[in-house]
Amino acid sequence: MSERFIKNIKDLKFKPFDNYGKAIEGMNCHKISYDKKNGGFGTYILKMEPGAKSLPHVHQGFEEFYVIDGELQDVDGKIYKKGDFVTFEPGTEHNSLTKNGCLLIVFMRGINKPI
């Protein structure tokens, strides 16, 4: 029989977000099923503190996220708000920032590459 894991978001233990080889200031994650060893497939919760900014990167596979709380602004000015579900197709290049902080659940299908 397979195992089942249940976590309440209030009980998560966040660690520095280091998907590009080094921690990014103001970005922390809790990996649920995400693993680079399986090709970067899986899910994690991402917490971005006010003023945090992701590195510019290109998507090797699909990346989707749901904004649980706060707002996230993409480099092109598009703002994603609480309740938005966003899909990036393979080949998409971008980076994001948050003025007031945000909490996302991220679904990855492939490892992003910094540019």
Summary of predicted features, one role per range:
Residues G40-F41, V58-Q60, K78-I79, T98-N100:
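Short glycine/proline-enriched turns and hinge-like loops at secondary-structure junctions
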Residues V75-E93:
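Short acidic-glycine-tyrosine-enriched beta hairpin
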Residues P90-I115:
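Ligand-binding loop in jelly-roll beta-barrel domains
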Residues N28-H59, E89-E93:
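Conserved short histidine dyad/triad with adjacent acidic residue
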Residues M1-G40:
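A short, N-terminal "cap"/entry segment at the start of jelly-roll beta-barrel domains
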Residues H59-V75:
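Glycine- and acidic-residue-biased ligand/ion/polar-headgroup-sensing regions
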